[in-house]
């Protein structure tokens, strides 16, 4: 994770500090997501919530790891304050608008949920032909991805999405 993130602002000013490096910030955003509302209103019941990036149909999936933290905006606000962002912060969420089912709608719904805890999000929904090159150039602070394990093994999405970037070593 980078020390600086290109599209993050605190009190209206660009910051050199990347708030996403703090686990409390990431947990706050996670706990501010009302997954049941996303499932009902955005996905119209055609989704299966999961607490991990590994699908339940994939070797290596763990029911324990798939448990989600509860939706709790008050806990999220407290975590942000503890992390040094009592008034929240701003960032741009880049997402495709023609790659995943309801991708842009999900991005907008997340922005609305995060606004309730003081985090202002600009949703930059763009065609996938522009989105993926932007993300691969590291010209994004936060992006949306979906991933399937064509090998049916958890290693594939974990290595592709979670592995630390080490370009000189040729991985990440």
Question: Residue ranges of each PLM-predicted region?
Answer:
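Extracytoplasmic/periplasmic ligand-capture domains
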Residues: 1-42, 48, 58-172
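Extracytoplasmic/secretory soluble proteins
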Residues: 51-53
């Amino acid at each position: 994770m980078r020390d600086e993130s290109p599209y993050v602002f605190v009190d209206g000013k660009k910051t050199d500090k990347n708030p996403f490096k703090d686990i409390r910030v990431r947990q706050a955003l996670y706990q501010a997501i009302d997954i049941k509302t996303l499932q009902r209103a955005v996905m119209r019941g055609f989704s299966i919530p999961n607490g991990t990036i590994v699908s339940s149909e994939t070797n290596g999936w763990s029911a324990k790891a798939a448990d989600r933290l509860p939706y709790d905006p008050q806990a999220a606000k407290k975590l942000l304050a503890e992390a040094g962002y009592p008034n929240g912060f701003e960032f741009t969420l880049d997402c495709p608008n023609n790659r995943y089912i309801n991708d842009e709608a999900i991005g907008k719904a997340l922005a609305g949920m995060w606004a309730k805890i003081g985090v202002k999000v600009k949703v930059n929904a763009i065609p996938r032909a522009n989105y993926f090159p932007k993300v691969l150039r590291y010209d994004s602070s936060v992006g949306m991805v979906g991933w399937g394990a064509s090998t049916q093994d958890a290693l594939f999405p974990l290595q592709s999405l979670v592995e630390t970037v080490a370009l000189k070593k040729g991985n990440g």
